[in-house]
Amino acid sequence: MERDPFDRDQGGSNVGRDFERDHGDEPAPAFRDAAPDYLAPIDDDAPVSGHTPAPVATSSASETPEHDWQRAKELVYPAFRPVGTQCERIESFDLMAATADGKSHTQPLVDEGPAGLPVVYALDAGAFDVIVSGDHLRTWGIGAADLQDAAMRNLSTWSAAAPWTDEISGERRLVSSDTGDGWDAARILLPDVIDHLTRELGPHGRILIGLPERHILVAGSLRPNDDEFASLFADFVLETSGGADEPIDRRVFELVGGRLVEFAGIVAR
């Protein structure tokens, strides 16, 4: 027998609310028992299209490192950038003049590092870094020397606890830093690190240094008449830098008298 959609006894009607309709596996419908009050206060706990209210801020913007030097000075580190990086020279930045002119100084501040490598200053924000600009110094009310001192102090503290990897193959030896923290290449700025590499590698030959990317510092001892090692070292630096997300330099350097200079010997094949 066919079902009559207008017969209430058969579960259907086209008049009023159809409470008795068979919804199968669907959830039972919800019906309003009153018209909505559009002027009523919004219920903060009521979800809207799956939206979850944002967490309540526990601090003001003025307390973030970008605005508070007392917090920033514990988080700032030096970092290398490729030669040719467009930045504002830190030695030319004048805090008093920048404060007086009111102009924006959004370009990253850069120092000249060893072998002409640019050095910027980065705020460690965890998943990313904030590169320090002149606007930051103006907001913090500090000079370039304060920034440099804090960054080197933090790098030194971190480096003192960071491990080294030592690899030996016959008479060949590599010492490298690849912690993943992001400050490995910058370790070469520290006198203690230069002393360490000189002690470990210096007695056996020339000390080759590679800074292919931000996360790697590699050093090797080049013994006399081992040109093959120099070529292999140069190839590694070239390939690593070419595939890096944050490359620094494809050149091979060496330590001479405690100074980082460009290696004038064998180049990559």
Could you say what each language-model-derived stretch is?
Residues 94-255, 260-267:
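A contiguous, surface-oriented mixed alpha/beta subdomain in the mid-to-C-terminal portion of proteins
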Residues 9, 16, 20, 27-169:
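Extended, low-hydrophobicity segments enriched in charged/polar residues
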